[in-house]
């Protein structure tokens, strides 16, 4: 994998326009911090037609994890985007291709700033939200936004921070997710529980990523009686398993677990039966779209989530999703549109090949397909680190759906659209 340049440089936005959905974008920046990082500088709002993407890469990280490209965090400064490659905290994310999908959803919302969420808020009669204090941005006194020191240390894609939820109405309640292990979160949980005379009976973890499980040690330090009450789909040491359909009950709340892999293999959502609401974890966020491990698996999980017909979503990041069915429809529609474009491009390339007198399936490599979709003048890093992995993942999903296939010719894997007559 090529290391990113040490200094900023302009890249024509046409190279990533279609993949990222950057309507009217003008410039993309690549770089890695050296000396005085511009992350410490104010990020000043730019005219609305401008989109700036700043990608940071630590060469030591790339050498250690050459196939890993961490997901983006998008700062809500009109249409400015910050990305940071970072090994610690949050999660070591995952699939360099599907982060492109995540960018698109966020960028579509950059005309508005993210809403402010209270540190502790009663968002329904049965649900109390406590922010994990691992926000991905900090608003400076001068009104400009810059990256939180916590962002540089770990969490990406955390938006206003990880949402942790205290669920129930009685003395004994359950907790969903534990944040990233930020001391301020532990203090908030302690004061909130003590102030309302609440005791925790169960701790349910949506998945293994560190911005959801990092607070477990603090909980056990403060409440050692919880040592037998930590639940996760694929349990770690000292944890108990959660099975699909398993039900947890406390006064005022019946919570049913639903296995929804995609964002991660062990991802669980939880349905709050009394409210017809779903704790969506990282599969569906309050703002934008989530990065995922396996596109086909994630889309299947979203369709399954649709079938459950929950009205409201309580996401692991971002504001309450007041119309969960519409949000799920939007997520699936956006991904389907990208699949259709790949298939249509393959068909067009076959037609052009046959028009030139060639025979066969008109199969092409991923590199050729990317060129056909995005032009010849692509920056090499944009091609190899973003567009090609993205298109390759979409092709794998389409192959599972029997819409494309590949053949090996000249030692190269070449893809073609399956046309049914």
Curated annotation (Swiss-Prot):
Give binding positions for Zn(2+) 2.
211-212
Binding-site residues for Zn(2+) 1, renumbered to this chain:
207, 209
The GO annotation for biological process reads: secondary metabolite biosynthetic process
Q: Outline the inducing conditions.
A: Expression is positively regulated by the transcription factors brlA and laeA.
Q: Which GO terms describe its molecular function?
A: hydrolase activity; metal ion binding
Record pathway: Secondary metabolite biosynthesis
Deleted gene: phenotype:
Impairs the production of trypacidin and pathway intermediates including questin.
> Which reaction does this enzyme catalyse, per its entry?
atrochrysone carboxyl-[ACP] + H2O = atrochrysone carboxylate + holo-[ACP] + H(+)
Co-factor binding comment: Binds 2 Zn(2+) ions per subunit.
Cofactor(s) needed, names only, are: Zn(2+)
Q: Which domain of life is it from?
A: Eukaryota
Q: What is its EC number?
A: 3.1.2.-
Active-site positions, per UniProt? 211
Q: Which Pfam family, just one, is annotated for this protein? A: Lactamase_B
Keywords attached to this Swiss-Prot or TrEMBL record, sorted alphabetically, are: Hydrolase, Metal-binding, Zinc
Its biological purpose: Atrochrysone carboxyl ACP thioesterase; part of the gene cluster that mediates the biosynthesis of trypacidin, a mycotoxin with antiprotozoal activity and that plays a role in the infection process. The pathway begins with the synthesis of atrochrysone thioester by the polyketide synthase (PKS) tpcC. The atrochrysone carboxyl ACP thioesterase tpcB then breaks the thioester bond and releases the atrochrysone carboxylic acid from tpcC. The decarboxylase tpcK converts atrochrysone carboxylic acid to atrochrysone which is further reduced into emodin anthrone.
Name by which UniProt lists this protein: Atrochrysone carboxyl ACP thioesterase
Species of origin reads Aspergillus fumigatus (strain ATCC MYA-4609 / CBS 101355 / FGSC A1100 / Af293)
């Amino acid at each position: 994998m090529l290391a990113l340049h040490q200094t900023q440089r302009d890249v024509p936005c046409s190279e990533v326009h279609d993949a990222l959905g950057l309507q009217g974008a003008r410039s993309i920046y690549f770089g890695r911090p050296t000396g005085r990082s511009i992350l410490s500088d104010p990020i000043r709002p730019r005219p609305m037609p401008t989109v700036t993407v700043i990608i940071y890469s630590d060469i030591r990280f790339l050498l250690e994890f050459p196939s890993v490209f961490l997901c983006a965090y998008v700062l809500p400064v009109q249409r400015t985007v910050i990305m940071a490659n970072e090994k610690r905290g949050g999660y070591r994310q995952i699939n360099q291709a599907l982060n492109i999908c995540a960018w698109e959803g966020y960028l579509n919302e950059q005309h508005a700033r993210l809403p402010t969420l209270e540190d502790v808020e009663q968002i329904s009669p049965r649900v109390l939200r406590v922010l994990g204090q691992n926000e991905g941005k900090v608003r400076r006194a001068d009104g400009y936004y810059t990256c939180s020191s916590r962002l540089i240390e770990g969490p990406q894609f955390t938006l206003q921070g990880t949402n942790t939820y205290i669920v129930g109405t009685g003395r004994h309640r359950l907790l969903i997710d534990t944040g990233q292990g930020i001391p301020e979160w532990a203090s908030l949980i302690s004061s909130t529980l003590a102030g309302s005379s609440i005791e925790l009976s169960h701790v349910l973890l949506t998945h293994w990523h560190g911005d959801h499980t990092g607070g477990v040690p603090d909980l056990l330090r403060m409440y050692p009686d919880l040592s037998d009450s930590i639940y996760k789909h694929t349990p770690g040491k000292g944890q108990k398993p959660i099975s699909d359909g398993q039900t947890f009950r406390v006064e005022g709340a019946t919570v049913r677990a639903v296995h929804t892999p995609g964002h991660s293999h062990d991802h669980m959502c939880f349905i709050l039966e009394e409210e017809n609401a779903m704790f969506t974890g990282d599969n569906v966020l309050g703002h934008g779209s989530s990065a995922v491990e396996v596109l086909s698996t994630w889309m299947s999980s979203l369709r399954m989530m649709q079938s459950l017909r929950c009205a409201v979503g309580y996401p692991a990041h971002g504001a309450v999703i007041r119309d969960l069915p519409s949000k799920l429809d939007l997520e699936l529609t956006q991904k389907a549109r990208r699949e259709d474009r790949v298939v249509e491009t393959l068909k067009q390339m076959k037609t052009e090949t046959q028009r030139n007198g060639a025979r066969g399936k008109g199969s092409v490599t991923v590199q050729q397909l990317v060129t056909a979709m995005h032009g010849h003048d692509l920056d090499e890093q944009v091609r190899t680190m973003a567009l090609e992995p993205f298109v390759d993942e979409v092709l794998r999903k389409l192959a599972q759906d029997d819409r494309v296939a590949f053949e090996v010719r000249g030692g190269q894997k070449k893809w073609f659209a399956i046309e049914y007559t």
